[in-house]
Every structure is written in structure tokens, then in C-alpha cells.
Amino acid sequence: WDYRREPCARYQFDGLTTGYPNGEVSWHYIKDLQDYDAVSLLKSFNKNSIRNIQSAFDFNLLVRNAEREEIPIFKKIIEETGKRQGFEDKNLDYYIKLYDMFGDRADFLIAEVNPQQSIDALNVKMASLDKKSKQFHQQYQALQKKKDFLTSLDSESSNVALACALIIYTNTEATYLFGGSYAEYQKFSAPFLLQYHAMKQTMQRNIHQYNFLGIQGIFDGSDGVLRFKQNF
């Protein structure tokens, strides 16, 4: 048999799969963390990300791991995000089983703010501004707007949950499985701070690869998830 004498089979390449067929992720967005420290990592982000993270610092946000009994708080954020963005949330039992199964190989991160502590921190920052600087009035007004926003918060709790992220760790990779945030708290820039915190935690575990996981594989600017992940 001489393959050269056979008629050429005609194949057509239909392109790579886009979207999330059957809920599966075809495209991954990965950042290499090797050779970074906390300072150089932050500098590696784009200007929009750095600005948002600095704003989160101004608000004195706290990022911490949720306790098992706080999983409903975590789930509520994901649920609200799903309603807003059009995806279906898991049930509470899913999160609890995942928490129990992965143990310290999973971080259920919550970003929150204590309004009064945040106001106190802003007061200190405002008092330390250089009044002789050309940017003084602009900087002062920006911090004052943050104070006004904090004062307007109507919360019965001393700490207000803003956003969350679930990070899964293996020996070689950290994966940002999913996350969410409350739309009314977007000014806090909590999702940006969560990603920075998660990457620092990844480096502390001596893991060099951070997987943002799914993107649609559509690069015409219409994929909002990709645009967010490209900030880092």
C-alpha cells in the first residue's frame, strides 16, 4: 500500500472550542509567580489593578479565611453574584463538603470592612497628607469621599462582608475556583484585593503557578471575566 497514491482526505479545522461547553473549562488563564515577592508581584499588575488595590488598602479591608460555620455567608455572596451574572449557584451542602474534604488545601476567603475602623484609618491617612503638595486637595477630597461612603453604610454588623474567593491548592498549582462580590460594594475594590492576597498566600506555600481558571477563549474584548483576570 502506497499512501502517496491514495486520494487526499480533506479536513477542515473548525477552530478551538469557546465558551464553557457542558460546563467544562476549555481555556485557562495562568500567572507564573516564580521570582516574585509581594512588592514586585503588585508592580507586575496593570495600572487599573494597582489603583483598585491601593483603594482597598485605603479602606483598611480585611481578608481572612471563613470558618466552617461562616460558609453560609460565603455562599450568599456567590448566590447574589450568580443572580446578577446569570450562573447557577451550588447548594450549601456542596460548599460544606468541599470545606471538609480539602481542609487546609482550600481557602474560603472573605474580604470585609469594619466601617468605623476604616473611618479611623482614613482619618489618620488624611492627617498625614502633605498640605504643601500640589496633590493635597485632590488626595484629601478622594479620601473624604471614601469616608462619606462608609458613613452611608447601613449595617447591623460591625464587619460587612464584601466579596469572596475559593482557592484550591495542589503541590504545584493554586486554582481560583470561583468567587463573587456584592454589587453595592463595588467601590471597595474587594475582588482585586482578594486576588492579590490569594497570590501572596500561594507564594508562601512555595507554589509558583496561579490558575485563574476559566475564560471563554473569545478575545474580541467581550469577555468580562477575561478583562478582569488580565488586570493581574
Indicate where each model-derived feature is located.
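Hydrophobic alpha-helix feature that most strongly marks membrane-spanning transmembrane helices
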Residues: 198-199, 203, 207, 230
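Conserved GNAT acetyl-CoA-binding A-motif
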Residues: 1-5, 203-214
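Conserved acetyl-CoA pyrophosphate-binding loop and the N-cap/start of the following alpha-helix
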Residues: 185-197
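Active-site-proximal structural scaffolding
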Residues: 160, 188-191, 208, 222
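A conserved beta-strand-loop-helix scaffold within acyl/acetyltransferase catalytic domains
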Residues: 6-187, 201, 218
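Generic recognition of stable, solvent-exposed alpha-helical segments in well-folded globular domains
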Residues: 69, 190-193, 224-227
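C-terminal catalytic domain of photolyase/cryptochrome flavoproteins
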Residues: 214-232
